[in-house]
Design a protein with these regions (language model features):
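SH3/SH3-like beta-barrel superfamily modules
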Residues: 67-100, 138-174
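Catalytic domains of carbohydrate-active enzymes, especially glycoside hydrolases
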Residues: 242-267, 363-368, 450, 525-532
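Glycine-rich, aromatic-flanked loop segments that form ligand/cofactor-binding clefts
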Residues: 256-261, 287-335, 368-372
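SH3/SH3-like (including bacterial SH3b) beta-barrel domains
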Residues: 58-70, 127-139
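Active-site-adjacent "subsite" loops/lids of carbohydrate-active enzymes
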Residues: 220-237, 313-360, 519
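Substrate-binding cleft of secreted/luminal carbohydrate-active enzymes
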Residues: 448-462, 471-477, 482-554
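Boundary regions of SH3-family modules and the immediately adjacent low-complexity/disordered segments
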Residues: 39-44, 91-118, 161-219
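Aromatic-lined carbohydrate-recognition surfaces of secreted/lumenal glycan-active proteins
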Residues: 233, 305-315, 370, 397-436, ...
Length: 554
């Protein structure tokens, strides 16, 4: 055997010895490490769970260190949960903090431990999309929590999924409280006592049962509402001649237009929403959506604030397409009341239809949606007395509750989309009672961005030889003073923006209403403190009448 071969064998043996020594040293080191250093426990991903917005955390001795936000993702020691330990270790940097086992959830869906919440205001639940309104809930009603839809950075629930004996659905966090006492309390007990004392004088509902909790309002970014709106009204035909009306308004004080989207049977454009809900309305359209959009845009391009008007619970087309939605006799035959058919204000599908339509139309260029005919029919008293009317009242609500709850639902959706909401009411509504048709000024003004009374002088009854339509200043001023008194009775009143009579009186002696009479109406409103503006009501949108009176509208 050569010397080279012997050297190779000797070198290989040395390598083996070295490797064996290293293995032995490693094993010895591991034994020593295990003896003096505890094993690193296995951790799992989880979420902080709590009935409140945070969960307390403790040190090893049980002293509270602070809190963790509900819903925060953490790493926790799995064996602490599995073994039923009194505290669960949660990784905190290079060490641990400790929480109660109940404050750890394996899934995000288990982060909210609240079992019951309470409705802050009377309203309707909605489905997961927030689009379809569901069952009514009453102020202070207990709602069983069945889930939630998101948490904010502070651990607050964004929306609660709840159920009650009437149904199930979603409700936003701002509309619930965690105790029945908090939910049932009135925001302003002194103001509430005023409403409660009024009761139910005319069958429209008890003022005590309406909601007076403030509605969050305010400027919408990118959508500026004038402090005083000075508007001409354009029906569905008139908007097709937008250029002509803009020439009339040019250089005057007019800064806005009210444009019909739908006015009873008069449909301004072929709406896809109408095609879905009411094909006969779609078929009756006076113009295409494209043309309608272009004409609305002309008003916007001229710097005008544009309001879209929708009649809600007066709809002959919907009544024809869906008679099951309509106020009827006890056999289900729709009743024609005051020469109209009335989809019930209790019907949630009607709510959704009109709000879907509002959102579709608003996207065509409107700043605001104005809801008209937000009421039950006048003229139903004889049917009520005879017990021969079916209002389709599923949840036992009053008329005024249905009107207010529709507005709460619609305003939430429209505000979320960046549009203002206004509501038209009878001039009578400025009085200190709930009207027979379900309108109560403080409850409506509390929800909308602007409330629009219709104190047309020729709509008031004569008192002997005194004819209110012969005294436009006095008639409108009296209304304005009453309206401002009602405004003081709610915590979040909308602007008072009033319809003024812009047509010749329809009652003897058929007074002419020209620039002087309209100037009296405008001055009366301002003198009474109704500073939100005015809108000219002329059903025909008579351009010659507008030319005649325009000097009074600056």
């Amino acid at each position: 055997m050569s010397t080279k071969t012997e050297k190779k064998r000797g070198g290989g043996a040395a390598v083996v010895v070295i490797v064996l020594c290293l293995i032995a040293l490693g094993a010895l080191g591991y034994v020593i490490w295990r003896q003096f250093c505890p094993a690193v426990p296995d951790t799992a991903a989880g979420y902080v769970a709590s009935a409140g917005t945070t969960a307390p955390v403790y040190d090893e001795k049980g002293e509270q260190l602070g809190s963790l936000v509900r819903g925060a993702e953490v790493q926790y020691v799995a064996e602490d949960v599995e073994s039923g330990a009194e505290r669960v270790r949660v990784v905190n940097g290079e060490g641990y903090v400790y929480v109660a086992p109940a404050n750890i959830a394996a899934d995000y869906s288990g982060a909210v431990l609240t079992e019951t919440v309470y409705a802050l205001r009377g309203m309707s639940l909605v489905d997961e999309t927030g689009v379809t309104p569901g069952c009514a809930v009453e102020k202070g009603m207990a709602l069983t929590v069945t889930g939630f839809d998101g948490l904010d950075e502070a651990g607050q629930v964004l929306r609660w999924r709840v159920s009650c004996d009437r149904g199930e659905g979603y409700i936003s966090n701002e509309n619930v409280r965690l105790t029945q006492e908090e939910a049932a309390a009135q925001y302003d007990a002194e103001a509430y006592a005023i409403h409660a004392a009024r009761g139910d004088a005319w069958g429209g509902g008890d003022a005590a049962d309406l909601d007076y909790y403030p509605t969050e309002k305010g400027p919408i970014p990118g959508n500026d509402m004038p402090d005083e709106v000075r508007a001409l009204y354009l029906n569905g035909s008139a908007i097709q001649y937008a250029d002509s009306y803009l020439r009339v308004a040019a250089g005057t004080g007019i800064n806005a237009f009210v444009v019909d989207i739908v006015d009873g049977t008069a449909v301004s454009y072929a709406s896809p929403v109408m095609q879905q809900y009411s094909p006969s309305a779609y078929a009756a359209a006076q113009d295409t959506m494209e043309n309608f959009r272009a004409n609305v845009q002309k008003l916007r391009d001229a710097g005008c604030y544009v309001i879209g008007r929708i009649t809600v619970f007066n709809d002959a087309h919907l009544a024809a397409d869906h008679p099951e939605y309509v106020i009827s006799d006890l056999d289900g035959t729709p009743l024609k009341i005051s020469s109209m058919y009335w989809p019930s204000a209790y019907n949630r599908t009607v709510w959704q239809y009109k709000t879907d339509l509002a959102l579709e139309a608003a996207a065509l260029g409107f700043n605001e949606i104005q809801f008209d005919y937000i009421r039950f029919p006048d003229g139903a008293y004889k049917y009520e007395q005879a017990g021969t009317i079916d209002y389709k009242n599923t949840y036992g609500e009053s008329k005024a509750q249905a009107v207010q709850r529709f507005l709460i639902y619609a305003a939430q959706r429209l505000h979320d989309a960046g549009y203002y909401v206004s509501g038209d009411v009878f001039g009578e509504c400025a009085n200190a009672y709930v009207t027979a048709c379900g309108q109560y000024w403080p409850a409506i003004s509390s929800v909308v961005d602007a409330i629009s009374g219709m104190p047309y002088p020729d709509h008031y009854s004569a008192q002997g030889d005194y004819k209110p339509w012969e005294h436009p200043y006095t008639t409108v001023h009296n209304f304005g003073e009453s309206a401002m008194a009602r405004q003081s009775e709610t915590a979040s009143p909308g602007a008072v923006r009033t319809w003024i009579q812009c047509y010749n009186a329809i009652r003897e002696p058929y007074n002419h209403y020209g620039a002087a009479e309209l100037a009296d109406e405008v001055r009366a409103l301002r003198d009474a403190g109704c500073t939100g503006g005015f809108m000219t009501w002329n059903g025909a949108s008579d351009i010659d009448k507008y030319r005649e009176v325009i000097s009074a509208l600056s």
